[in-house]
Amino acid sequence: MRRGAVGIGTLIVFIAMVLVAAVAAAVLINTSGYLQQKSQATGRQTTQEVASGIKVTSVIGHVDTTNNAIDKLAIYVSPNAGSEGIDLRYTKIVLRSKSQEVSLYYNRSNYYNGAVDNIFDISGVWPSNGYTFGIVVIQDSDNSVQQNYPTLNQGDLVALTVNANAALGGIKPGTSISGEVIPEQGAPGVIEFTTPSTYTETVVELQ
């Protein structure tokens, strides 16, 4: 009887161990599936964030020959490949010199959509202050870059206009400027240039 009881007890313990192992395996499988799904979702989100964003295609400066300094900046931007629409109302420009940093936001009063010969000759697109920027539409086949709701889509190209005198006190020769064009979502566009040691033209390609 005692041996039988011991045998039954051992069997019960064995069955209990098997059940515990089965439950643990089920928990591990469920956890593994959850983590895999979460990892895939995170990967998709990260890929979208990397793909979306804005890029700076060029930066052009206008030289005030009287003060020998750049008084206007035209920052040309377009969406990254695979990017969704970028609302320029919620995009900001950050500019840094050695001595200061400024942030600029869109002012719908400084907007232009029409023929462009010399961007620096267009009136009404250059802010009078150092904390806003304007928009000059260069290419917009789907008419998404509207004055009140300027949305940058694939294939669009605009110039963001900055009053460099008001924002940075003018940009002298040999000055290093850095910054970003930061959309509400996605990767920012990078601004990085050093002005020439001398200004020989009134229009200077900086980046």
From Swiss-Prot:
<dbReference type="InterPro" id="IPR013373">
    <property type="entry name" value="Flagellin/pilin_N_arc"/>
</dbReference>
<dbReference type="GO" id="GO:0005198">
    <property type="term" value="F:structural molecule activity"/>
</dbReference>
<comment type="function">
    <text>Flagellin is the subunit protein which polymerizes to form the filaments of archaeal flagella.</text>
</comment>
<dbReference type="InterPro" id="IPR002774">
    <property type="entry name" value="Flagellin_arc"/>
</dbReference>
<comment type="similarity">
    <text>Belongs to the archaeal flagellin family.</text>
</comment>
<protein>
    <recommendedName>
        <fullName>Probable flagellin PH0548</fullName>
    </recommendedName>
</protein>
<dbReference type="GO" id="GO:0097589">
    <property type="term" value="C:archaeal-type flagellum"/>
</dbReference>
<keyword id="KW-0974">Archaeal flagellum</keyword>
<dbReference type="Pfam" id="PF01917">
    <property type="entry name" value="Arch_flagellin"/>
</dbReference>
<dbReference type="GO" id="GO:0097588">
    <property type="term" value="P:archaeal or bacterial-type flagellum-dependent cell motility"/>
</dbReference>
